[in-house]
Amino acid sequence: MGYDVTRFQGDVDEDLICPICSGVLEEPVQAPHCEHAFCNACITQWFSQQQTCPVDRSVVTVAHLRPVPRIMRNMLSKLQIACDNAVFGCSAVVRLDNLMSHLSDCEHNPKRPVTCEQGCGLEMPKDELPNHNCIKHLRSVVQQQQTRIAELEKTSAEHKHQLAEQKRDIQLLKAYMRAIRSVNPNLQNLEETIEYNEILEWVNSLQPARVTRWGGMISTPDAVLQAVIKRSLVESGCPASIVNELIENAHERSWPQGLATLETRQMNRRYYENYVAKRIPGKQAVVVMACENQHMGDDMVQEPGLVMIFAHGVEEI
């Protein structure tokens, strides 16, 4: 449908008026033979009833329509039109070709996006702001989040159940292998290979770490701290066969000779940067696995590995 003629300043050339809606042409198209021009929406609707020109009744179809000449487009673009939002207080009069850009920024546009400044920060059309209720919106947001959290908790529980079943299957398999090892001693090597590969897979899944404050090492962690680190090891996928050994090796009483006392640690501190360390997820702690630190002397590593806990200074590389 065309633009209302009363919105324009001055007289509008009759050649720019749509014969169907009697408004100023909007998205104009032209019949090629008779050269009559119409709004695109108007003529499309007309053709749904009959395939003729509304003015002279000559045969015309949608396929025949063409854009109007440039001179007509230029005449239309120069027309001065009042803003669509005049009824809402906008007094702007702009060129027709600038109307859309003006509408997108017009402060009187009732559909212009605005942000609630009462606390919830919701973006909404301007005309909805007077009836907006922050509490109602936030309640809806909380409900959506609670629903999402419930879905995630359900998924997490399912994954934990699957993981527990897999771990149980692995333990049963290991128990089976130990049971038949007496029948075939060669299975000892097979079991050791499987466990070693399992350890390597876990170690490779951890993020490499750098310790920036070796002086913050906690060499005598209490039972509570050890339990926290053990839980993180288990959650990271640490093989059950070495979890307890690693936690035992978190205390200086189980450390190798080069780390056994404060004095020896100070003497050997220059070697610390040579350690290949992996971060225990979410903790200020690292594991120094023997399989990754064969370049270190026997007095600096321990089978299957060391757990070093720090007050601060552990960074992922």
Swiss-Prot record:
UniProt keyword list: Apoptosis, Autophagy, Metal-binding, Transferase, Ubl conjugation, Ubl conjugation pathway, Zinc, Zinc-finger
* Gene Ontology MF term list: erythropoietin receptor binding; identical protein binding; interleukin-3 receptor binding; protein domain specific binding; receptor tyrosine kinase binding; small GTPase binding; ubiquitin protein ligase activity; ubiquitin-protein transferase activity
Which E.C. number(s) belong to this protein? Answer: 2.3.2.27
> From which residue to which do the SIAH-type zinc fingers run?
78-138
Please give the SMART domains that the UniProt record associates with this protein.
RING
The record's listing under Pfam families reads: USP8_interact, zf-C3HC4_2
Enumerate the PROSITE patterns for this protein: ZF_RING_1 (PS00518), ZF_RING_2 (PS50089), ZF_SIAH (PS51081)
What this chain does, per the entry, is described as: Acts as E3 ubiquitin-protein ligase and regulates the degradation of target proteins. Polyubiquitinates MYD88. Negatively regulates MYD88-dependent production of pro-inflammatory cytokines. Can promote TRIF-dependent production of type I interferon and inhibits infection with vesicular stomatitis virus. Promotes also activation of TBK1 and IRF3. Involved in the ubiquitination of erythropoietin (EPO) and interleukin-3 (IL-3) receptors.
Protein name, entry field: E3 ubiquitin-protein ligase NRDP1
Identify the species of origin.
Homo sapiens (Human)
